[in-house]
């Protein structure tokens, strides 16, 4: 079974899951007005190399965990490519009760088909939309640039508040992580791991400084 996890920031303690897979996550601390990305310099490479990491979802199922403040949701996340090339994403518990049902058109337009009332808050819906769009990995690369820290390459895609960074190894053979950033620091970090037949076996999304409410 594939695994998908979305969590809010970790504050005082590390959050650990105890099953056959293990997540240990800690919040990253920043101080002053210095930028987490100030060490990046222009790099060499083709921004389009990240397209090879776009998940080839046709009809995929994940065992999913979503933590929203005091609420913990677990169940099955279905991702299905529809005949019109849109993508349908449904999160439900194991007896079929839906938590949310979203669609993304081929052009990336978002539709909220359904969401559970306790989750139906503007900030939560916006965060879920942005998170899922991030891991579907269909960025517009028209204004993208390649930066480097001399260890990894960062394909920087401008967004309204900063950049989405697609971090790869120097040769762009491995997707290290995806970061949605403000102008100074990452606010969301996504990891797509253990690709098999074009599909990540595990997906982990963590918010660094945002509390769902």
PLM features: residue spans?
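Acidic/charged, solvent-exposed loop-and-adjacent secondary-structure segments enriched in E/D, K/R, S/T
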Residues: 110-142
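Hydrophobic/aromatic beta-strand elements that line small-molecule binding cavities or substrate pockets
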Residues: 75-80, 102, 190-194
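Post-signal-peptide N-terminal segment of Sec-exported extracytoplasmic proteins
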Residues: 53-88
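Short, basic, low-complexity termini and linkers enriched in Ser/Thr/Gly/Pro
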Residues: 11-26
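Membrane-embedded segments
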Residues: 87-100, 104, 110
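C-terminal motif of bacterial Sec signal peptides marking the signal peptidase cleavage site
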Residues: 29-32
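Bacterial signal peptide processing site
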Residues: 34-37
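Gly/Pro-enriched, hydrophobic low-complexity segments
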Residues: 152-213
């Amino acid at each position: 079974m594939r695994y998908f996890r979305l969590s809010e920031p970790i504050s005082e303690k590390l959050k650990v899951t105890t099953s056959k897979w293990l997540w240990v996550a800690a919040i990253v601390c920043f101080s002053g007005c210095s930028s987490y990305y100030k060490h990046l310099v222009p790099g060499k490479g083709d921004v389009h190399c990240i397209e090879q990491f776009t998940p080839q979802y046709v009809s995929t199922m994940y065992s999913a965990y979503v933590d929203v403040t005091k609420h913990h949701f677990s169940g099955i996340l279905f991702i299905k490519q529809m005949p019109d090339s849109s993508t349908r994403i449904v999160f439900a518990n194991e007896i079929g009760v839906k938590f949310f049902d979203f669609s993304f058109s081929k052009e990336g337009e978002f539709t909220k088909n359904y969401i559970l009332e306790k989750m139906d808050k503007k900030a939560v819906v916006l965060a879920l939309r942005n998170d899922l769009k991030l891991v579907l990995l269909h960025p517009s690369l028209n204004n993208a640039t390649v930066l480097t820290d001399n260890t990894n390459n960062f394909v920087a895609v401008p967004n309204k508040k900063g950049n989405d960074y697609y971090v790869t190894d120097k040769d762009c053979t491995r997707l290290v992580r995806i970061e949605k950033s403000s102008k100074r620091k990452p606010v969301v970090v996504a990891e797509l791991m253990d690709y098999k037949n074009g599909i990540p076996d595990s997906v982990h999304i963590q918010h660094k400084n945002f509390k769902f409410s």
